[in-house]
Amino acid sequence: MPRASDILSHGIPYEASNRAVPNKIDWRESGYVTGVKDQGNCGSCWAFSTTGTMEGQYMKNERTSISFSEQQLVDCSGPWGNNGCGGGLMENAYEYLKQFGLETESSYPYRAVEGQCRYNRQLGVAKVTGYYTLHSGNEAGLKSLVGSEGPAAVAVDVESDFMMYRSGIYQSQTCSPLGLNHAVLAVGYGTQDGTDYWIVKNSWGLSWGERGYIRMARNRGNMCGIASLASLPMVARFP
């Protein structure tokens, strides 16, 4: 994934509001987060990160939990700069979703391979009207975004110790704030025994980590770049 400074973003730079955000939050408890998914042998993490933050915002606005289609983004958002199973960016997906409605997982199911776009406008459910971006590496800003708005799409530098993670608060000595190579979803944050952490939803199935999740050390100098390429869309019903 490219550096944030290399991206020509059409998003709105997020500015933390003055209103206080909670010291801890877990959006799973409010129904903003769907079940853990599995991207399989396809480099589509960016699509899962996109649908994850879309699902949270749709729940926030419509009070309805819907699992959205990653496969539609894999198959259809290439002209907006994405590369299917070869990688992509959440912000490119938002640009696509400004023009096309996002279908549900059930109407456009995941296949873990890039195929021909089979988008059906009649089945579109949600669209993007704009999106916030946070490229500063400022974890306080990300806390404000997640704490006040909901689950946010983020990117991190994944090294072998991340892949081998089983449980506990992950603290890496090897990952970089710059080498972003994997997109995930920040669904909350908290503190345990004096150690601040992010609650992060991955797309590697339930058998990885803490039933598909990882708690990543927070306020450790933007560890693994979690606050270097964050975003959150404004979502409305389609059309």
Task: List the predicted regions and their residue ranges.
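Catalytic-core signature of thiol
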Residues: 1-239
